[in-house]
Amino acid sequence: MSRKINDTFDACFWEEYLESQGSRLPPLPDVQRITPRVVRVLAGNPGGFQLQGTNTYLVGSGREKILIDTGQGLPVWIDHIAQVVAENDLKIVAALITHWHGDHTGGVPDLLVHFPHLKSAIYKNQPDRGQQDILDGQVFQVEGATIRALHTPGHAVDHMCFVLEEEQAIFTGDNVLGHGFTVVEDLGAYTNSLGIMNDQGCQIGYPAHGVVITDMPAKMAEYRDQRLRRERQVISALRESRQKNAGRGSITVQEVVQSVHGTVPEDVSKKALEPFMQEVLLKLAGDRKVAFELQGGVKRWFIVGNRV
């Protein structure tokens, strides 16, 4: 399934992400109790972009539960949720949404049909009409679960993660996945959000896609190293251009892609690699490591001074 993350990025391709999809993903059960206070319910929407499907979670050790995310809106998801609630005499008291993408919000209408008491208890940063706002640092509690909200934009402007204090665990949303890497809307904001997530000191990660992350510090280091590797590749391309050409040796984002990746199909470059490299360049510009000049209305990028 292809969907737009921003105005330029068609999320049908991202190199490391799709490489991870080429491997065999471990199967996940439709419903699984992961710990005494966390039950995972798959949304029934497996695919190249959603991995085994969107993970939704029922959280709490008592009768009352907090739901995290609502899947894509497929009937199988609400059927599983309703079955778990009925068989265990549970009550969902609130639903927390990690971000606006349809594979996380699509189940809200079905949820309200089955559980109309939740009409005033759907929480989301930058809420839709009738929903409640989630503030950074806001705390939600049920028996056995204290959930603290973190505003962590980058993958999406409204992205929230949720720390489960009792388990030293974090619901990572789409910021960190159980397999491979995520797509990013704003790399500068995303980099800052990774730092916020890492600072929580959580050991376990419950992602919105993929398996449980059993070593969160190691996973965060993996994500940091991947981002830094991409920055080094871009810097290397700009440095090589400056060495080969007179003046600043400025080059276009298309030329950066060609330097880093070689010759790739035009649609792959336009739809995926160029928007991603543009985000890397903008992040480096924010760090004052690179800048651009306009030539014929086209941005040409170069290294700033001798900073790198």
Swiss-Prot record:
Zn(2+) 2 binds at residues 103-104. It holds the Pfam family Lactamase_B. It catalyses: atrochrysone carboxyl-[ACP] + H2O = atrochrysone carboxylate + holo-[ACP] + H(+). Its cofactor is Zn(2+). GO terms for molecular function: hydrolase activity; metal ion binding. One of its GO terms (biological process) is secondary metabolite biosynthetic process. The keyword Ribosomal protein does not apply. It is an enzyme of class 3 (hydrolase). Signal peptide: none annotated. Zn(2+) 1 binds at residues 99, 101. Pathway: Secondary metabolite biosynthesis. The keyword Isomerase does not apply. Keywords: Hydrolase, Metal-binding, Zinc. The active site is at 103 (proton donor/acceptor). Binds 2 Zn(2+) ions per subunit. Its EC number is 3.1.2.-. Atrochrysone carboxyl ACP thioesterase; part of the gene cluster that mediates the biosynthesis of physcion, a natural anthraquinone fungicide that can prevent plant fungal infections. The pathway begins with the polyketide synthase AcPKS that condenses 8 malonyl-CoA units to synthesize atrochrysone thioester which is released from the synthase by the atrochrysone carboxyl ACP thioesterase AcTE that breaks the thioester bond and leads to free atrochrysone carboxylic acid. Spontaneous decarboxylation of atrochrysone carboxylic acid leads to the formation of atrochrysone. Belongs to the metallo-beta-lactamase superfamily. This is Atrochrysone carboxyl ACP thioesterase. It comes from Aspergillus chevalieri.
